[in-house]
Amino acid sequence: VQINSGVAVLEEEGVLLDKLVVKAASATLTAGTDYTAAFDDNGYVNIVVIPGGAGKSATSLTVSGVQIDPSAVTPADIVGAVSAAGVESGMECIRMIFPKLNMVPGILIAPGWSENAIVSAGLQAKTTRINGVFNCVCIVDIDSSTNGATKYDDVKQQKEKQAVTSANCYAVWLYAKVGDVLYAGSAMAAAVTVATDADNGDIPNVSPSNKTVPISAACLKDGTEVLLDQEQANVVNSFGVATWLNINGFRLWGNNTACYPGNTDPKDRWFSVRRFFCWDDNTFIQTYFQKVDSPANKRLIEALVDSENVRGNSFVSRGICARYELKYLESENPTTNLLNGCITFHKYMTPFGPAEDIEELVEFDPDALSTALAQ
């Protein structure tokens, strides 16, 4: 590799920096002492020769190492497993997020892979009871390759073929194109979703649907552009699948989770409501975990009820929920449960759903003519 102005550019993608072997003539250079290596915006490796190092007078470098091969990855690798030795891989590593980082997964995605039925099934399964207690959602792609749905009216059949049915799943059809670069719909939809959360105080009560996104086209996996009008996009939505719609700029279009239309329960079908339920449950667990193993007395019960209802009143006053109230009901806490150290609280929660249809009724009033012309 030729050195120009102290920098050698290795024009290869997927190179592992910690496996690089860099030589100047016959001398092997040491990372951090003789050179530094980093990726540029193209994914190439920039090797900077350090003045005073062993390669200071070199005009070229000999570079070898390990390069990843994305084509060798299989759906089974993405789903993962637990080996006989207890080593976790793929989606099995989701379990490790909270104990390692103390962060609860919010959205699971596998761009470029979730259009595979095995992967999408794995993602849906992993959204519930993470670490035994937490819940989240996933965003998956409906296959738009030649083997999938290439027309909007094929989406229903392809969704069923992929077995995408979970209330914790948001399905997206079509890739997004920015310039000449294609992005999986699931990746772009996830970005729109978290951006919407950030614009609303990190509370996931607002639907990402109808939020503009800076893309230049919606397309099939092979890059073929697809122009959907609102009527066609609504048909896709009726299958429980979101897509991209261009009305004064591209926007994500669709409020329903993948359980729709088979399940029309508002807490399950609306993506924003479903996410709010997951988020609120996870927040409750994290907030009051410190109370676990405290004396199960009246003071503990009142503290939890009062604290949660103060929070709930804030949600109601800000128009986030129509109702948010926590109660301790004696009927749900028999003596046998209390003796076993189990306390149950009952929460009444109604986050506002999206205004998916706004209709106008227009009436012609003939009497207004005579009134207007009366002398």
Kindly give the residue locations of the regions a language model identified:
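Generic recognition of long tandem-repeat/solenoid scaffolds
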Residues: 3, 8-11, 42-52, 243-260, ...
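A glycine- and small-residue-enriched flexible loop/hinge signal that marks low-structured segments
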Residues: 84-287, 329
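Acidic, low-complexity glycine/serine/threonine-rich segments
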Residues: 270-331
